[in-house]
Amino acid sequence: PDITPPNFVSGTISYDDSISSGGRRIILTLSETIDLTPISLVNISCFILSENGVDDIVILDGATATGIDGLTLTIEMTESQRVLSVLASNTPGGDGSGIRINFLKGGVQDIGTLQNLAQTNLSLTEIADVRSPTLLSQAIDYDTGILTLTFSETIDTTPKSLVIPGSMYIGQTSNLAGAVQLTEDTTTAVN
């Protein structure tokens, strides 16, 4: 009989939304084949990102697990989970400490239905977010004068001096001829 539970042995976390860079995913490798059929066998709330193995930063509840029976499990983080992870990472935008992952008992099971045991402080290889955000849409409220910009990922507006309205122009075409340069420095972040 199978008496050895699955153990997490390595992992990679990608902070970049680009599919070629990993696409906001955590890829975990295990010591033996895990049962991912159906994928609902994965209890995603048992996966916790940590800065030092002790202080929890992000419980991955709400993330999406994918994979087939095998040695790897892929977890796609939500945008807010990705942002919180970047802040505690050893990549640009982070605090230099690096991300680790903790596992509660019962996150996955092997083919013999043995669940993983609790495990802490697994170091993750980090892939930096190197892709610039893309402007997806914009809207002007002519009654209030508020310009709302929507981007492909979270924009760091803390402190607000990181946003430079003077570098933005409003116009009817992609060139700057006839465009109006923004000068007001009132910036408000909205999730």
What do the predicted segments below correspond to?
Residues 1-191:
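Non-catalytic beta-sheet/beta-sandwich ligand-binding modules that flank or precede catalytic cores
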